[in-house]
UniProtKB/Swiss-Prot annotation:
SUPFAM superfamilies: CarD-like, P-loop containing nucleoside triphosphate hydrolases, TRCF domain-like
Broad EC category: hydrolase
Gene name of the record: mfd
Lineage: Bacteria, Pseudomonadati, Pseudomonadota, Gammaproteobacteria, Pasteurellales
One example of a Gene Ontology biological process annotation: transcription-coupled nucleotide-excision repair, DNA damage recognition
Official protein name in the record: Transcription-repair-coupling factor
Protein location: Cytoplasm
Signal peptide: none
Domain Helicase C-terminal: 800-953
Amino acid sequence: MKTAFFQPDIPTQPNDHKILGNVLPGADALAISEISEQNQNLTVVVTPDTRSAVRLSRVLSELSSQDVCLFPDWETLPYDTFSPHQEIISSRLSALFHLQNAKKGIFLLPISTLMQRLCPPQYLQHNVLLIKKGDRLVIDKMRLQLEAAGYRAVEQVLEHGEYAVRGALLDLFPMGSAVPFRLDFFDDEIDSIRTFDVDTQRTLDEISSINLLPAHEFPTDDKGIEFFRAQFRETFGEIRRDPEHIYQQISKGTLISGIEYWQPLFFAEMATLFDYLPEQTLFVDMENNQTQGERFYQDAKQRYEQRKVDPMRPLLSPEKLWLNVDEVNRRLKSYPRITFKAEKVRSSVRQKNLPVAALPEVTIQSQQKEPLGQLRQFIEHFKGNVLFSVETEGRRETLLDLLSPLKLKPKQIQSLEQIENEKFSLLVSSLEQGFIIEQSLPVAIIGEANLLGKRIQQRSRDKRKTINPDTLVRNLAELKIGQPVVHLDHGVGRYGGLVTLDTGGIKAEYLLLNYANESKLYVPVTSLHLISRYVGGSDESAPLHKLGNEAWAKSRQKAAEKIRDVAAELLDVYAQREAKKGFAFKYDREEFQQFSATFPFEETYDQEMAINAVISDMCQPKAMDRLVCGDVGFGKTEVAMRAAFLAVMNHKQVAVLVPTTLLAQQHYENFKDRFANLPVNVEVLSRFKTAKEQKQILENLAEGKVDILIGTHKLIQSDVKFNDLGLLIIDEEHRFGVGQKEKIKQLRANIDILTLTATPIPRTLNMAMNGIRDLSIISTPPARRLSIKTFVRQNDDLVVREAILREILRGGQVYYLHNDVASIENTAEKLTALVPEARVIVGHGQMRERELERVMSDFYHQRYNVLVCSTIIETGIDVPTANTIIIERADHFGLAQLHQLRGRVGRSHHQAYAYLLTPPPKMMTKDAERRLDALENLDNLGAGFILATHDLEIRGAGELLGNEQSGQIESIGFSLYMELLDAAVKALKEGREPSLEELTQQQADIELRVPALLPDDYLGDVNMRLSFYKRIAAAESKAELDELKVELIDRFGLLPDATKNLLQITELRLLVEPLNVVRIDAGTQGGFIEFSAKAQVNPDKFIQLIQKEPIVYRFDGPFKFKFMKDLSDNKVRLEFVVDLLRTIAA
């Protein structure tokens, strides 16, 4: 900001301490920005808590031209049994590393973090490794260096501090780096360093060098552990021999949770942040820091007293881990500093006041006769310029609407420097609390909080990357030994692992399946397309078939007959839908791209696929009916907005139907936001509007003056008349009642319909999978960095208190779910007594609606930080600061519901926690235990879709699909049922009767006696190998195989011969599919190709071959074509068979 609004008096000498008074709420960021611009050195800002540090870093990033760095807190409680998330350690190490050379900029941290003792600067200096392209480095030596630096060896690199070695490739994700890297070695030289995408694992850009920081804030190599042991013995004396004792655990290299609280034992002497700072650093200190610092230290002492009694975890005293406030003050005397005070101070050499004044009351009072009275009065009497600050583009539109009665049209400016040129201006920024700058021409800054009451501090969401929703249901990657699988020809067996067998000197890998009576079946990996996971009931109730027995064939025959009827019924519905004529929307590429460009995040792969599918549906003349299924917070709303944009640009109206008023309000704000710069009128029908306003909206709707209308079931009442409705968007359809669904059906006649859902309830999942509705899955996990940590715990006051404290101390909020309205108030009282630090409020569905809105709104605006609630929050509003959910009696909920509830948290850049509280195991059903296990283990997937299929396994298919079908599914498994159904629908569409032979069509049996596998020294992880085998076997074209080949080379290095053979044999299978070949067999002396009786091949090809080389070729019976030739070389044999088949197929 070039026009300084006040001249700060910058102290430069040690212990030169100035006071800046009159720093009103909101003005602190402006004052810091001015100070750091004028200061020639680094400015360190110390805040009373994490929340204010986060707020200031957000505002300063917008206002200041300086680099702004937030040094994060561990986000754990003193002496916690949790460790900080890797992401936090990564940011801290990176900040400390760069701090040593920082000359200027703003460095923010809360007082509790300034009090923390840290690793000494030498630790980082000596343990940073610079790796450059062209360096000579033995890969095994590099592996040892990584181990010594605390990096974890994994199969696939996903998080900071991990590495993986595959042949000549080394993947690693250095601490402090935004992306992971892949190093390609040629002998002992680094041939290339490339970044790669965590989700697809494919490489991106080439770079020349990387800095490798250690993986922890303490050394974990042998020397470090040895030093720890000596210090531990010296500190605590006698050691228990119990293997669970922390000393024994760390001695054998186990980094236990909460190990950070023994960090001083890894160093001869600890440092503090002061040891990292340049001498001339200027400190800016907030008024409440002393009080908060003392409170934190007292809290640490109290927790030390409570916890030091655990003989397995003897604790270090607080002074070993933190400085107390007196020590901090003493250290601060070595630096120049400025302390902010809210009150005015008496002016002197040391003390100065910030030239600002408080705004008078300008709140909009919607209940009053003249809502804008106070604002009007202020503007009429104020002699200077007025700047309105709003947080987003959409709120800018809302503000302009609000100001229209005053005939005000503020000019939008891009930065504070432009204030002076305009009487009324408007800035999109995070300055939410206003004040008046007193100068020759005063400036009044009016923030949203001044006009609308305190608003929430939004935390930015992360840009999200994506994984391809790889045939999740049929994928074998999750298989565990002993789980049931279905073989198309032999029925249901149990998975026994991958085994390598040597037959006639040729190594090949097989999938071992165990059947009844201890029979074993070895399935070659080239036939994995015949295998699918058994889904359809619990593992225990899955059948176990006998090999070579008729039972399986009968089950399959029976299921196939039933499936034919289902397919016919489906097609009937499908045909009716196809016959429905819709409106073919026109697509203007340029307009659409301009709108898309205003989306503030990067679209994920799935999101793009879903958007493209929706747009392409809308441009067809038939009516769209598409289900977009994606987890809570995965960007389904953006898909809906793009569809709405296309409809509105085609002069059609859009209705958005949502289950709750609060959700309607939130969608309204989001839509307003996105359509802010367009001539689009967005309205909402909800109880927030007066009867008069609702009437006006309905009149405008009928006249076509409203483009997008958002609302609850009010939208489908008979008095709502659209002028020209073109698109209906339904959010969470399963939440509407039967009567409401009927009304929606009547609306459906010929308009395009887009349904959004977070948990595909399996019935809708099935319909979508069968193509009655088109389905797009957005399975992109929320930013992979911080998935939701889920704990299943027996209900215990200590667990609850810790969980709530951990969250509110980092400035967050907690949902406490107690699903019994009769006792909910008692629970709230109990919590208030248990955690007096919390501000508790109650919300449930039996409250009067107005009251519930107020509760939710108060929680949203952070007036309370614990909401004791019923399942009303299931489709709640987005509260980005709520990052812990505690669910009582979690064993009473279904999987989909628990998943949905858990999705209410984890929407910002903080680690989110879900605690599922249960009674003792004796009081739970087996199913409930399995549900909770599934949820605890699925914390890192875009799991809504996967959970729906898990639900099919746990609940069985019966209650989901109606009993008629469930019998068939129990007997043959869900995956196979779906495959057969697909084939039946396809046949009927083409006007053919589906035959069982066709449904269970055999693929050619190919035996060429060459090694064809993914060797385990090439791809070590069994599940990943299984997954690739399945993907190779399921490939449907040469292009797909080529793509897999590129991916294998990119991720694991050059292909071994056996893998080249595997891909070539698969290509051969694709080549012979249309020829109806039953078997191909070739050995060292020749072989044969056997055709099925219904093969249709051109006999001329065979005649030409026999005439050309009668010694080599001949027929043996009507269906077997033989060749005799020396084929002892594997490569020659493979190429000969491929060429021969190409000739026949041509």
